[in-house]
């Protein structure tokens, strides 16, 4: 049976996901059968598994790095936020309901058996299971019934490596402080630490590594320099998705993307960001739509009606509607497609409080939210004339006159999506479209951006190989492997 090693962090966004991905590729290159595992993830960025389940996108990237198919057991509990205090709960790939934060804390203990079952199943397939924790290991206020960090590590008897991020500052305090606040039995699970995202001369932090080791008693397992190739990998969470974007002076086409509170599957933007000829501008609902916009792209949402209300509250809906009236192009993906219709209805409160609302009125369609979720990989040919591969992940059924002009013909499934009579307004439920080089090239041709210059999926593979080489150069893989049990 496989050995396992868990990577926890001093906080969120310290690089746990990419470290696990890079190590998965590095150990797979050594001939080991590797499986990634994250007991609990919180993300609206999800991937579809072959059996019609869903897991966090970070675990999908890690599975790709390990060169193995996706499995719902790689992320047995996925929380998909629907509000500031509540989330949809997905267990072993299937939606089991929604829960407020306080109720979920009581629910967690009942989920541990499913988590351990998934972990055991992966161990039967692998030589090595690389486990990723969630958030911070030091959130001791949430320790009761924990399944994401030390609660899992102790239940499954998996040794832990703690990761700190020096790029954000305070890494010595964060690592030493974690040891200070942890229960002694939890702290004893930690076998060593890694300092991640270092910039500058490593010799200058040698004494820092010694200080941390001296205060904690943990082994110093490595100082990992900042990996610039990470920008070529899919976004792992929403932190920074609405952050400032550097202008692209050579870009011929500018795409405006409203970033709404419950944005989902935002990695649809990554392939577009990678193209030198496209400038993808994230804008807030309170912003004015830039006058030089060539395309408005409305992306996915975990709470479509609530996000449409946020768009209206900021006033940006007026600009989008005026842009469309002037002949501007608008494309909606999944939740964005639903917003573009004449009305949305959620009679059973699937995404939030029961109710209905007017849509943006850009397409002659309407959507009714239903409890049944469609999770499937798809292939087909779009109205842009190019074939594609992608996936659907949505609730809701959309019907109306404009569906007579579908956005795509899906192989084995028929017509999908809707297009306005003038062809300038389009909506589809398909995610992952623009990760397909053929479809991205077709969009760029339509917008006058020139030919596509990026082989996106090949670039992801190159970045994973580069990450594996980077970690191999700065970490002792044999020592890490010796810690696993």
Curated annotation (Swiss-Prot):
Keywords: Cobalamin biosynthesis, Glutamine amidotransferase
A GO term for molecular function: ABC-type vitamin B12 transporter activity
Name assigned to this protein: Cobyric acid synthase
Residue intervals of the GATase cobBQ-type domain: 252-439
Entries under SUPFAM superfamilies matching the protein: Class I glutamine amidotransferase-like, P-loop containing nucleoside triphosphate hydrolases
Gene Ontology biological process terms from the UniProt entry: cobalamin biosynthetic process
Family, as annotated: Belongs to the CobB/CobQ family. CobQ subfamily.
The protein's annotated pathway: Cofactor biosynthesis; adenosylcobalamin biosynthesis
Function: Catalyzes amidations at positions B, D, E, and G on adenosylcobyrinic A,C-diamide. NH(2) groups are provided by glutamine, and one molecule of ATP is hydrogenolyzed for each amidation.
Catalytic-site annotation from UniProt: 334, 431
InterPro entries: Class_I_gatase-like (IPR029062), CobQ/CobB/MinD/ParA_Nub-bd_dom (IPR002586), CobQ_GATase1 (IPR033949), CobQ_synth (IPR004459), GATase_3 (IPR011698), P-loop_NTPase (IPR027417)
Keyword Signal attributed: no
């Amino acid at each position: 049976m496989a050995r396992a090693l868990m990577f926890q962090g001093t906080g969120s966004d310290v690089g746990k996901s990419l470290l696990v991905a890079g190590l998965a590729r590095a150990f797979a290159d050594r001939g080991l059968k590797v499986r990634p595992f994250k007991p609990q993830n919180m993300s609206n960025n999800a991937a579809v598994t072959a059996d019609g389940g869903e897991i966090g996108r970070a675990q999908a990237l890690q599975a790709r790095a390990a060169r193995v198919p996706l499995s719902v057991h790689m992320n047995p509990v996925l929380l998909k936020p629907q509000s500031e205090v509540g989330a949809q709960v997905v267990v072993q790939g299937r939606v089991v309901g929604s829960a407020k934060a306080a109720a979920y804390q009581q629910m967690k203990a009942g989920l541990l058996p499913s988590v351990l079952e998934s972990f055991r199943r992966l161990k039967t397939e692998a030589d090595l299971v690389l486990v990723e924790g969630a958030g911070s290991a030091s959130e001791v206020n949430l320790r009761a019934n924990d399944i994401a960090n030390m609660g899992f590590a102790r239940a499954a008897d998996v040794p832990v490596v703690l990761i700190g991020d020096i790029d954000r500052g305070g890494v010595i305090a964060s690592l030493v402080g974690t040891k200070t606040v942890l229960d002694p039995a939890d702290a004893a699970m930690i076998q060593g630490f890694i300092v991640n995202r270092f910039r500058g001369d490593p010799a200058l932090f040698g004494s820092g590594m010694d200080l941390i080791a001296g205060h904690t008693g943990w082994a110093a397992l490595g100082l990992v320099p900042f990996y610039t190739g990470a920008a070529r990998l899919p976004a792992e969470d929403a932190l920074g998705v609405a952050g400032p974007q550097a202008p692209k002076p050579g870009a011929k086409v500018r795409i405006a993307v409203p970033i709404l509170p419950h944005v989902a599957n935002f990695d649809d933007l990554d392939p577009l960001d990678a193209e030198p000829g496209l400038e993808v501008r994230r804008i807030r609902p309170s912003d004015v739509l830039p006058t030089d916009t060539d395309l408005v792209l409305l992306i996915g949402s975990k709470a479509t009606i609530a996000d449409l209300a946020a768009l209206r509250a900021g006033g940006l809906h007026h600009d989008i509607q005026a842009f469309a009236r002037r002949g501007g192009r608008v494309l909606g993906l999944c939740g964005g497609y639903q917003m573009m219709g004449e009305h949305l209805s959620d009679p059973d409160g699937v995404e939030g409080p029961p109710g209905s609302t007017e849509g943006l009125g850009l397409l002659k369609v309407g959507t009714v939210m239903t409890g049944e979720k469609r999770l499937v990989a798809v292939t087909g040919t779009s109205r842009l004339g190019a074939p594609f591969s992608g996936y659907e992940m949505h609730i809701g059924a959309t019907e109306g006159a404009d569906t007579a002009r579908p956005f795509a013909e899906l192989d084995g499934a028929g017509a999908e999506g809707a297009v306005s009579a003038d062809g300038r307004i389009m909506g589809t439920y398909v995610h992952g479209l623009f990760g397909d080089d053929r479809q991205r090239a077709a969009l760029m041709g339509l917008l006058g951006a020139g030919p596509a210059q990026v082989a996106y999926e090949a670039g992801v593979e190159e970045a994973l190989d580069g990450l594996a080489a980077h970690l191999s150069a700065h970490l002792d893989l044999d020592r890490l492997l010796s810690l696993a049990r």
